[in-house]
Each structure stands twice: as structure tokens, then as C-alpha cells.
Amino acid sequence: MELATRYQIPKEVADIFNAPSDDEEFVGFRDDVPMETLSSEESCDSFDSLESGKQQDVRFHSKYFTEELRRIFIEDTDSETEDFAGFTQSDLNGKTNPEVMVVESDLSDDGKASLVSEEEEDEEEDKATPRRSRSRRSSIGLRVAFQFPTKKLANKPDKNSSSEQLFSSARLQNEKKTILERKKDCRQVIQREDSTSESEDDSRDESQESSDALLKRTMNIKENKAMLAQLLAELNSMPDFFPVRTPTSASRKKTVRRAFSEGQITRRMNPTRSARPPEKFALENFTVSAAKFAEEFYSFRRRKTIGGKCREYRRRHRISSFRPVEDITEEDLENVAITVRDKIYDKVLGNTCHQCRQKTIDTKTVCRNQGCCGVRGQFCGPCLRNRYGEDVRSALLDPDWVCPPCRGICNCSYCRKRDGRCATGILIHLAKFYGYDNVKEYLESLQKELVEDN
């Protein structure tokens, strides 16, 4: 409910408004025209017309103009240096002013908050200004509050203009804020409803698709079963084209093989291989002495006739491999390897053993036969002892020592393959098991047994 009351301004208040100010003269308000609609230029023109006409009946249009406000304008301050201490608690609560209470009740909470914030801003500005300006403002009274702005400040609103402008602007701001908040709430509600509806639609579509897929699957299964039944019926109706075999073998059960036999478990033997020795393993085809065999063998190698003429055998590395007994030193004898661990392998500086074909730097035997050459007469300590039962040191110090290949008793893989026999492999452990010291004696015993059996 708006208050539309008009009060006739007394002469004292009119004198206050008609008194000249610092910058320009204030001649009063124009009758029946609100101050909000007047600009700075129009207000000046209206004041000139009022001054020329000397209108005494000046009316102040404000619904908030009360007796207390009129008394404040009439009373004069005691001194120019006195400051305004503010309103009392009763004035703020509105107990003595029922009209102000009505206006405050019309305002909403947002309007009251805006008014309080504006009052705080005014207090901060007053604190920021120096004391002289404040004393001057208090000495003039409230006449400065109703001064019209100049042409430069025409667009800027005056904070101390009137209470009507203050309340109207506060109401407009509050209405705008409430409208914006309502719009935002409506948009949020609409968005939530749209999202929920979309999610519900998606879930419905997914459930419908899944149900459709299940229905199609069941229909396909039924159709396939019906088709298979029809095909089987057609096949059964035509036995001439597709004869049905009687399951004779299905009735017979296969005999289950047992993993272990009930009798005594026999030792598992390795399968026969081509590398294993034949039946006549160590049997020699001749029964001559070793010396005669060696003589015949070397004479055969030296006799390579071409047109009835003999050709001498070319000797290779004869000078480098032959060492007389006088050249053997104590260092050479100490360098002889007794076991396999004493052998040091060296592919650059080492020399090769005829039996094991390993290139080591230990001292090896030297064959004193004039027809022996190269690696043929070189045997290391372990090979000469295990395979033939001889010692390398005694062989080096013997000027008449001849290597096993020259004697025709070599049992290495190359020599046995050349003679048409298979390789023996590692037989030293088997020979020691049967009570022999070397492989040569074990092979000779086998040969004697075979000869005796024949």
C-alpha cells in the first residue's frame, strides 16, 4: 500500500530551500512535477520560472515526509563544529514512527539488505573524507543533500537526493534479483526433468532392445530345431540313398592297457642305434703280431706307385714336431698334465692332442719314429694313461718311444673309423669296473674272448 499524502511546506522550510548555496541558488520545487523526471537543465529552467513568478505556494511531493523530518529541517545546529552522532535505537526500530514502520514492512529482505549495505558504504566514505569537509557539511545542515548536480554530473545519481528514489531503486533491484533467481530455479528444474526423462528413455530403449534380442534368439532356436527335425525325418524316409551303418564297433570295448605289469619289472634298455657296436665289436680279422702289422702298414703307405715307380711320402712339420731327448728340460717335465684339471686350454699358443683333439699348453709326447709327423704322435697325460696305460714323462725320456698310431694300437675315433670300426666313447670307467687300468687292455680282453668263442 502506497502512501499518497501531500504536506504543505511551512515558511521556515521554504526559506531553507530558497537560501543560496555555494555553487548555485535553489529556488524550490516545481508544483505537481516529480524530481525523478527532471534533468539538470530542466531543473534550472524550472527554478528560473519559479523565481520570476514568485510563487509562494510551494509543494514538496514525498510520501515519506513526516513531522519528525520537518522538525529536523526547522531546528538549527548549535555550532558549526558539531558532528551528527546518528540516530537512536528507538528511531532505528521505528517505535515512534508508524509510517516508517509501514514502509519498512513493505520492503523485502533483499531490499533491507541493500539499504544496509548502502548505509555502510556511506559511512566508509564519510570516514575517508577529512574532518574539515565533514565539519563544513554539518555546519550547512541537510541543505547540501538537496543540491542539484551540475551539468557534468547529470547522469550520476545523488545518494542523498531523497528517500523516495532510494526506496524505489531498492525495490527495482530486489524485484530484478527475485525474477533472475526464479528464472534460474525454473531452468534448473527444467534441466533436471529433461535429464531424468532422457535417462528413463535410454533405459527403456536398452531394456526394449535386450528383450527384442532375446525374443529373436528364441525364435531362431525354434526355427533351427524345426528345420533339423524336418531334415532328419526326410533322411529317415529315404534309406536307399543314405544307408545307416549299424554300430558294431561301439559295442566292443577296448582293452585298457595297464601302465605296469603284474610280474617282475624289467630294466628299461635304450633302443638300438646305428652308432652302437655290431656283434663282432673287438674281433680282428687277422691274427698277426703288432710289429708285423705296423711294418706292412707303413710299407703300404710308402708304396704309391705311378707307372711302376715309387714316390716318397712328403713329410710335414717334421722339423718342428721332432724333439730329441737332449732338448727335454725339467720345465717340460713339470708342465705335463696329470689330470684333466691340470690342462689349460689355449686356441692360439696351445698344441692339439691326437686322442681328445683339445688344444692345450701342457707338454705332450714326441714320437721318435722317422715316418711320424704332426699331431699324430702328440698325446696328453690323461689320454695316454687312461687309453693306453703309459706315462708322458717316461715317453719323453725314452729315445725309442713310438706313438700308438705308429704301433697300430690307436683306439681314437678317427683311427677306428678309418679301419671300419665304430667309436668306443668313454670306456675308462667301464674298464676300471671290470678290473682293467686302461681301455687298451679292456679291448684286448674282449677280442680274446671273441676269438675263444669262435
UniProtKB/Swiss-Prot annotation:
The gene is CDCA7L. A motif (Integrase domain-binding motif 1 (IBM1)) lies at residues 9-33. InterPro entries: CDCA7/CDA7L, Znf-4CXXC_R1. Ubiquitous. Overexpressed in medulloblastoma. Residues 103-169, 188-213 are annotated as: Disordered. It is found in: Cytoplasm; Nucleus. GO terms for cellular component: cytosol; fibrillar center; nucleolus; nucleoplasm; nucleus. Residues 213-235 are annotated as: MYC-binding. The modification Phosphoserine is found at residues 21, 79, 105, 108, 117, 138-139, 162, 195, 197, 261. Phosphorylation increases its interaction with PSIP1. Cells lacking CDCA7L display a reduction of 25-30% of colony formation in medulloblastoma cell lines. CDCA7L overexpression induces colony formation. Changing residue 73 to A: Significant loss of interaction with PSIP1. Complete loss of interaction with PSIP1. Keywords: Cytoplasm, Isopeptide bond, Nucleus, Phosphoprotein, Repressor, Transcription, Transcription regulation, Ubl conjugation. Interacts with MYC. Interacts (via IBM motifs) with PSIP1 (via IBD domain); phosphorylation increases its affinity for PSIP1. The modification Phosphothreonine is found at residues 77, 81, 88. There is a cross-link at residues 222, 225 (Glycyl lysine isopeptide (Lys-Gly) (interchain with G-Cter in SUMO2)). This is Cell division cycle-associated 7-like protein. It comes from Homo sapiens. Changing residue 21 to D: Phosphomimetic mutant. Increased interaction with PSIP1. Plays a role in transcriptional regulation as a repressor that inhibits monoamine oxidase A (MAOA) activity and gene expression by binding to the promoter. Plays an important oncogenic role in mediating the full transforming effect of MYC in medulloblastoma cells. Involved in apoptotic signaling pathways; May act downstream of P38-kinase and BCL-2, but upstream of CASP3/caspase-3 as well as CCND1/cyclin D1 and E2F1. One of its GO terms (biological process) is positive regulation of cell population proliferation. Coiled coil: none annotated.
